[in-house]
UniProtKB/Swiss-Prot annotation:
Record protein name field: Aflatoxin cluster transcriptional coactivator aflS
DNA-binding interval(s): 95-114
Location, primary (coarse class): nucleus
InterPro entries: SAM-dependent_MTases_sf, WH-like_DNA-bd_sf, WH_DNA-bd_sf
The UniProt record lists the keyword DNA-binding: yes
Keyword Acetylation: no
Record's GO cellular component terms: nucleus
Job of this protein: Transcription factor; part of the gene cluster that mediates the biosynthesis of aflatoxin, a polyketide-derived furanocoumarin which is part of the most toxic and carcinogenic compounds among the known mycotoxins. AflS exhibits no DNA-binding capability on its own, but forms a complex with the other aflatoxin cluster transcription factor aflR and acts as a modulator of aflR's DNA-binding by decreasing its DNA-binding affinity.
Gene Ontology molecular-function annotations: DNA binding
Keywords from the named record: DNA-binding, Nucleus, Transcription, Transcription regulation
Subunit structure: Interacts with aflR.
Length: 438
């Protein structure tokens, strides 16, 4: 990065900061951010990261790594003794009272929380008293945040530290039971087996993956907005295999003429054959996450992943493939792509105007990606390596799978933003495959 780049980043930071300031959140945004400001926040953070990289000296990097290493240890200690839950959400209390409730020495409590004050986590409003900050309060009301921290400190950090031992013993082995995690815990069983036996670790892994992949999710939204949605009119978009309504909630305000169906995956024993447009399987929590003014345009349904798509009149079938994880390795995800294509052949054949849009995370970081996207790709890849010796999606295999089909499905367009880590394939049914490939 040059000095000109530094000036450009500084200007973009100033512009983003002014936009956020105009929103009127004087207390900061730790408690949440309106959807329309999320791109502004990402721009601010991405440029700040670039400025930090340019301005830092090697000694600054050492100090930063030392600080975050200790902060992670402090957060783990708080989690182990459930200290955060011992502090009232809206008032300060003496350190002594918190220490008594948590059953920890007061002197240790004071020393371990004060480093966290430097990052806006907890605060000392008056001498000898501790209180929640806006940020730390979220770790009480949203337990998944603490689950992610505990997974990093208890499972991922020891695994990362064992990479040298793993390499000396197993080299470039791809066997799941030869991973750095196996070295760290002294187990001969693969990490996937641990997840089956320890629900707590499985829950923590899910929380960790949801937060580190958040920029991938933002990239899906960004990439999809580059597709040609305006000419669809009063059409229906089906989000196939959705884990949550977050993507359609993000898209709905941008395309007010569209209706959306959030189609979750049904269990074989839970009524998977019931009509897809019935609102069964919806939880109160998921419903509450949809803004009231959008609920009239968002409906719910379920479908077995192996079943043919029952919604016949949609204009777009949207399938978002996640990054590989210990629970869903790359080979399994490639099989899911093939399964999803097979499930939609009939509906696309009967409606040649309909499109299937398949989004996938990029398998490696590129120079054009912003800092958050590069970090998400690297974190996901390293986590997979350390825990299972697994690898990223092979985009060559995915492209071969899409190009070699003989059922009439053809990739009409490949779309991606240069700054994020998501690629989208627009697929339609064509009788003459050879003349319509991208």
């Amino acid at each position: 990065m040059t000095l000109t780049d530094l000036e450009t980043c500084a200007e973009e930071i100033a512009t983003a900061a002014r936009t956020l300031a105009r929103d009127g959140h004087s207390g900061g945004y730790s408690a949440g951010l309106p959807d329309h400001l999320r791109p502004v926040q990402r721009t601010l953070i991405a440029n700040a990261s670039q400025v930090l990289a340019l301005a830092s000296q090697p000694a600054d990097l050492v100090r930063q790594l030392a600080l975050y290493n200790q902060l992670l240890a402090c957060l783990r200690w708080l989690g182990e003794f459930q200290v955060l839950a011992c502090i009232p959400l809206d008032e300060s209390v003496p350190f002594e009272d918190v220490a008594d409730i948590a059953g920890v020495p007061e002197c240790r409590l004071r020393r371990l929380v004060r480093p966290l004050f430097t990052i806006g986590f907890l605060c000392e409003p008056s001498p000898g008293h501790v209180a929640h900050s806006v940020m730390s309060k979220q770790f009480v009301t949203q337990p998944a945040l603490l689950d992610a921290i505990l997974f990093m400190s208890e499972t991922l950090a020891p695994s990362a530290s064992a990479m040298g031992t793993q390499t000396r013993r197993f080299g470039a082995s791809e066997q799941a039971e030869d991973s750095a995690w196996n070295m760290a815990v002294g187990s001969d069983s693969p990490f996937a087996e641990c997840l089956q036996q320890r629900p707590k670790v499985k829950r923590q892994l899910g929380a960790y993956l949801s937060y580190v992949s958040s920029s991938i999710d933002a990239g899906v939204e960004d990439t999809l907005t580059r597709m040609n949605w305006q000419n669809l009119g009063m059409a229906t978009v089906v989000h196939v295999g959705a884990q949550s309504p977050s993507l359609v909630v993000a898209l709905a305000p941008q395309f007010p003429s569209l209706r959306f169906l959030v189609q979750t995956e049904a269990k074989a024993e839970s009524g998977g054959h019931q009509p897809c447009l019935d609102n069964h399987g919806i939880s109160a929590l998921k419903l509450a996450s949809i803004p009231l003014h959008l609920r009239a345009r968002i409906t719910w349904g379920t479908r077995l992943s192996t079943a043919t798509q029952p919604v016949l009149d949609a204009a777009v079938y949207l399938i978002s493939i996640p990054f590989p994880s210990p629970q869903s390795p790359a080979m399994e995800i490639t099989m899911r792509v093939a399964q999803a294509l097979k499930a939609h052949v009939e509906v696309l054949r009967n409606n040649s105007d309909a499109r299937l849009i398949l989004t996938l995370p990029m398998s490696s970081a590129t120079r054009s990606m912003d800092a958050a996207a590069r970090a998400a790709v690297s974190l996901s890849d390293l986590s997979l390596l350390q825990l299972t010796n697994g690898g990223s999606l092979n985009m060559g295999e995915i492209r071969d799978l899409l190009r070699s089909r003989s059922d009439g499905l053809v990739v009409m367009r490949e779309v991606r933003s240069p700054t994020n880590a998501v690629i989208a394939f627009e697929i339609q049914y064509r009788v003459d495959n050879d003349d319509n490939r991208y």
